[in-house]
From Swiss-Prot:
Responsible for the release of ribosomes from messenger RNA at the termination of protein biosynthesis. May increase the efficiency of translation by recycling ribosomes from one round of translation to another. One of its GO terms (biological process) is cytoplasmic translational termination. It comes from Nitrosomonas europaea (strain ATCC 19718 / CIP 103999 / KCTC 2705 / NBRC 14298). This is Ribosome-recycling factor. The lineage of its organism: Bacteria, Pseudomonadati, Pseudomonadota, Betaproteobacteria, Nitrosomonadales. GO terms for molecular function: ribosomal large subunit binding. The gene is frr.
Length: 185
């Protein structure tokens, strides 16, 4: 029973951490990466479709993402989807490729993005603490129903606290890495 509570808490914390990683990957830093466009949906004959299902997304050079669509009729739809996204990018079509140059971030924009990632990290920490609270409440129920002893309850709560501390440290590490990436010129 205690093992189930711990396992459930750990799985939920891992899911929260994975969600944070996905959120961080959507925040644009100074250098391009192909995952930056993963969440952009293109209107493909009336159906919103992820850009990676319609084209090859590659790094053309150190400051440019290259998109080579498989259907040559959707260049304008891809450009429009990227322009309408909140990334602040200005794509252009060059022969058979949509080129997305990555302008350098201004100092003000870097600070705004840093605030955003700090907020996302804090939300992940709160989620971890809520998972801990739910696990501890479940342990209290088991104790109340006399399914576990008090010392088992205390030991399990300590283990869940260690688990929470470990995942929160992981969140802090991800935040530090992302902040350094954002502030690098």
């Amino acid at each position: 029973m205690i093992a189930d509570v711990k396992k459930s808490a750990e799985q939920k914390m891992q899911k929260s951490l994975d969600a944070l990683k996905v959120d961080f990957s959507k925040v644009r830093s100074g250098r391009p990466h192909t995952g930056l466009l993963d969440h952009i949906m293109v209107d493909y004959y009336g159906t919103p479709t992820p850009i990676k299902q319609l084209a090859n997304v590659t790094l053309a050079d150190a400051r440019t993402i290259g998109i080579i669509p498989w259907d040559k009729k959707i260049f304008s739809a891809i450009e429009k989807a990227i322009r309408d996204s909140d990334l602040g990018l200005n794509p252009m079509t060059v022969s058979d490729m949509v080129r997305v140059p990555m302008p350098p971030l201004t100092e003000e924009r870097r600070k705004d993005l840093t605030k955003i990632v700090k907020t996302e990290a804090e939300a992940a920490r709160v989620a971890m603490r809520n998972i801990r609270r739910d696990a501890n409440a479940h342990l209290k129920e088991l104790l109340k129903d006399k399914l576990i002893a008090e010392d088992e309850d205390r030991r399990a709560q300590d283990e869940i606290q260690k688990l929470t501390d470990r995942y929160i440290a992981e969140v802090d590490k991800l935040l530090q890495t992302k902040e350094a990436e954002l502030m690098a010129v």
